[in-house]
Amino acid sequence: HEKELIEALQEVLKKLKSKRIPIYEKKYGQVPMCDAGEQCAVRKGARIGKLCDCPRGTSCNSFLLK
């Protein structure tokens, strides 16, 4: 299970490096919607916010970023 988490976090880091988050998303906490089943990071502490939010009625594959 730990290996899956590490792989998921590495994937997120790759995405973050290749895609800048617009300032308004940081400022107002607005995040893009993710596709059903897509992994979305859940805010844990002040370090990093959600990468995407789940549309209503769908379940996302979420994990915590510490």
From Swiss-Prot:
Alphabetized CDD domains for the sequence = CART_CTD-like
Q: Which GO terms describe its cellular component?
A: extracellular space; synapse
Keywords of this entry: Cleavage on pair of basic residues, Disulfide bond, Neuropeptide, Neurotransmitter, Secreted
InterPro entries cross-referenced by the UniProt entry: CART (IPR009106), CART_C_sf (IPR036722)
List, in alphabetical order, the GO biological process terms annotated in this UniProt record: adult feeding behavior; cellular response to starvation; chemical synaptic transmission; circadian regulation of gene expression; G protein-coupled receptor signaling pathway; intracellular glucose homeostasis; negative regulation of appetite; neuropeptide signaling pathway
Q: What is its main location?
A: secreted
Q: Which domain of life is it from?
A: Eukaryota
MF terms in GO: neuropeptide hormone activity
Disulphide bond pairs: C34-C52, C40-C60
**Record localization:** Secreted
Q: What does this protein do?
A: Satiety factor closely associated with the actions of leptin and neuropeptide y; this anorectic peptide inhibits both normal and starvation-induced feeding and completely blocks the feeding response induced by neuropeptide Y and regulated by leptin in the hypothalamus.
Q: Provide the family line.
A: Belongs to the CART family.
Q: What is the name of the protein in this document?
A: Cocaine- and amphetamine-regulated transcript protein
Q: What is the lineage of its organism?
A: Eukaryota, Metazoa, Chordata, Craniata, Vertebrata
